[in-house]
Amino acid sequence: MFPLLAFRGDRMEILKAKGIVKRFPGVVAVDNVDFEVYENEIVSLIGENGAGKSTLIKILTGVLKPDAGEILVNGERVEFHSPVDAFKKGISVIHQELNLCDNMTVAENIFLAYEAVRGQKRTLSSRVDENYMYTRSKELLDLIGAKFSPDALVRNLTTAQRQMVEICKALVKEPRIIFMDEPTSSLTVEETERLFEIIEMLKSRGISVVFVSHRLDEVMRISDRIVVMRDGKRIGELKKGEFDVDTIIKMMVGREVEFFPHGIETRPGEIALEVRNLKWKDKVKNVSFEVRKGEVLGFAGLVGAGRTETMLLVFGVNQKESGDIYVNGRKVEIKNPEDAIKMGIGLIPEDRKLQGLVLRMTVKDNIVLPSLKKISRWGLVLDERKEEEISEDYVKRLSIKTPSIYQITENLSGGNQQKVVLAKWLATNADILIFDEPTRGIDVGAKAEIHRMIRELAAQGKAVIMISSELPEILNLSDRIVVMWEGEITAVLDNREKRVTQEEIMYYASGQKKQNGRVA
């Protein structure tokens, strides 16, 4: 008997999941979900953290077994016991955390764990056909426009190049479907454009792509369909032509959300931090700027512009070669982060997991970590009760979703981890807060909360510096915008009337300098 195939228009349904259920202790992660993929399409799967997207992907790619439901490939029912089973059926996946071996070559990584002998599964006794492995790897690299050799060591590649290797790994068995989980989270604007070109090329060759991202502008641009999940359930889908940011956000969070806050007025006051002629290697070149109490100063620019490097000098992580730093009008020397903390400066770093938190510590311990000397008795004996009071206070103030202050921080969602980083600096009474990519990798609801917090902190009189690669974030949250290119400031733009455009920022971010002085 031939399998019953479903079609949408003239496109055949190549993957169908029906009534998928997955339970974990105390939670139904995926609740009776249907999901389908048609040939030659790009379908995005979106939802907040905890919506069930990752669990569903793991089921459809053989990492997890469902508790109920069925999966059909080309109309035939299948059971996946491992990712290899899914791979054999033409389903590949590229995870957000790239899974490569640094000390192996590109070609070895492409064939790792699958097939390095022609037509055979690799075993310990197999003789690796290195010529075939090199030739096939070169074909795949050429297909996606990669400019590096199959013999290159992976440890020497950039993040974007590593992702190209992952795409080649996914293509090595000529799949019908590739799942991509947050593929643009660590890419520059140019690298993201190149990835989208690759995705469109894959679609033209008959390969469907399931795209998972928190970046709604990317989702709406690249997708033929958008499927929305919330609380483990499939909420609905939208087709191209029906995409609308407000509609998508409401489907994701179940309520109206003000993505960028309105009506939170800031009144810039005295200069809180001033930097004059800061220099460091060839990364920061004579940088001068000031941020006032009660304002949000946005820093825009492409990757490599020197924004993060500048703030690491201000925070004392790196040592300036020349230049001066003034806090509240007083010249200061900041030789390390401890000096910066004493000056009332807090840094919410780009990589919260590596630089902002100790993931294996509790929420309480992370919040009080920079304040231990201040809240301990005689600077020696920890005051457990005081630690609990401070932690409970900031968990409540910032609406951090955690079972208790004794929850291990690693178990929180990305948005709540970001709030813990913010809480620890607010607990030090920092008056100058530096946010580096504050909403990277967090879902829409949490983004809206962070956006509101940034504006509210400025309204309370804090001096806020915000680095962001998301131009809508820069344009909607900043009172003034500093644009950098290759370590230099090319423009400072007045954005109090919210009249600066993305085109204007990109003009200066590409190296063009503002004439007739800076607009302050």
From Swiss-Prot:
Entry-linked SUPFAM superfamilies: P-loop containing nucleoside triphosphate hydrolases
User: Which cell locations does it reside in?
Assistant: Cell inner membrane
Give the top-rank taxon of the lineage listed in the UniProt record for this protein.
Bacteria
Report a single Gene Ontology molecular function. ATP hydrolysis activity
Main location per UniProt? Answer: membrane
Q: Which Pfam families match?
A: ABC_tran
Q: Report the membrane topology from the UniProt record.
A: Peripheral membrane protein
Cross-referenced CDD domains: ABC_Carb_Monos_I, ABC_Carb_Monos_II
Domain named ABC transporter is located at 15-256, 266-511
Q: Which InterPro entries match?
A: AAA+_ATPase (IPR003593), ABC_carbohydrate_import_ATPase (IPR050107), ABC_transporter-like_ATP-bd (IPR003439), ABC_transporter-like_CS (IPR017871), P-loop_NTPase (IPR027417)
Subunit info here reads: The complex is composed of an ATP-binding protein (RbsA), two transmembrane proteins (RbsC) and a solute-binding protein (RbsB).
What is the protein named? Ribose import ATP-binding protein RbsA 1
Organism annotation:
Thermotoga maritima (strain ATCC 43589 / DSM 3109 / JCM 10099 / NBRC 100826 / MSB8)
